[in-house]
């Protein structure tokens, strides 16, 4: 069996420690050697990003320049249509073949809305889900049929992610950082410091570009 590949999607507007540090911990916990970051172009589930795709891509490049764990996949940025995880995972599965273990990393908040995602039922056909826990969010789905779906696919053994190509959901005990892109944008608009919230090269670039003012 080939090594587990993990994908991490998001808007990253801007990228910050709340994105990077939990995933770095996750990698150590379950034995990931590479995490591919996939920034959205037009996210279908949330407001449009304030920074454009070129700026968000550059901030990510700055953030991961000294972090060999991470690599960047630009495919969604090159689409002129909404970015759907189901579509991206189908492409990855076709490129990697049927036997490579593949996982998609999401937050616990995203798990609760997961049944509203485009073609959500196909996602586990192509990948595992790794859920980073977050305080204040329930561990149960809102509807009984979705709770059953969760329980049917749930595993408590991260080794299962390495041994099967897709189909499992793993709830990871990752640290939670009280950081969000919204908080960072509000701080910047108010002229407050963000030095402790995101990598220094990213903050320097934000100031150079006059972003989030």
Curated annotation (Swiss-Prot):
The keyword ATP-binding applies. Activity is susceptible to product inhibition. Keywords: ATP-binding, NAD, Nucleotide-binding, Nucleotidyltransferase, Pyridine nucleotide biosynthesis, Transferase. Pathway: Cofactor biosynthesis; NAD(+) biosynthesis; deamido-NAD(+) from nicotinate D-ribonucleotide: step 1/1. InterPro entries: Cyt_trans-like (IPR004821), NadD/NMNAT (IPR005248), Rossmann-like_a/b/a_fold (IPR014729). It comes from the Bacteria. Its EC number is 2.7.7.18. Signal peptide: none annotated. Catalyzes the reversible adenylation of nicotinate mononucleotide (NaMN) to nicotinic acid adenine dinucleotide (NaAD). This is Nicotinate-nucleotide adenylyltransferase.
């Amino acid at each position: 069996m080939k090594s587990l590949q993990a994908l991490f999607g998001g808007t990253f507007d801007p990228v910050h420690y709340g994105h990077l540090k939990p995933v770095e911990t996750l990698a150590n916990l379950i034995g990931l050697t590479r995490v591919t970051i996939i920034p959205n172009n037009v996210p279908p589930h949330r407001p449009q990003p304030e920074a454009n795709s070129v700026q968000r891509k550059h901030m990510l490049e700055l953030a991961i320049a000294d972090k060999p764990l991470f690599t960047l996949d630009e495919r969604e940025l090159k689409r002129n249509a909404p970015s759907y995880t189901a579509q991206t995972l189908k492409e990855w599965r076709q490129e990697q073949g049927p036997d490579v273990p593949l996982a998609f990393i999401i937050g616990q908040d995203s798990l609760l809305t997961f049944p509203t995602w485009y073609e959500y039922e196909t996602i586990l056909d192509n990948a595992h889900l790794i859920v980073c826990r977050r305080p204040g969010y329930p561990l149960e789905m809102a509807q009984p049929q979705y709770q059953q779906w969760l329980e049917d696919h749930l595993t408590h053994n991260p080794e299962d992610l390495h041994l099967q190509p897709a189909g499992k959901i793993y709830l990871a005990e990752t640290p939670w950082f009280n950081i969000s892109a919204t908080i960072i944008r509000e701080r910047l608009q108010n002229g407050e410091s963000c030095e402790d919230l995101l990598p220094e090269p990213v903050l320097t670039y934000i100031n150079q570009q006059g972003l989030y003012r």
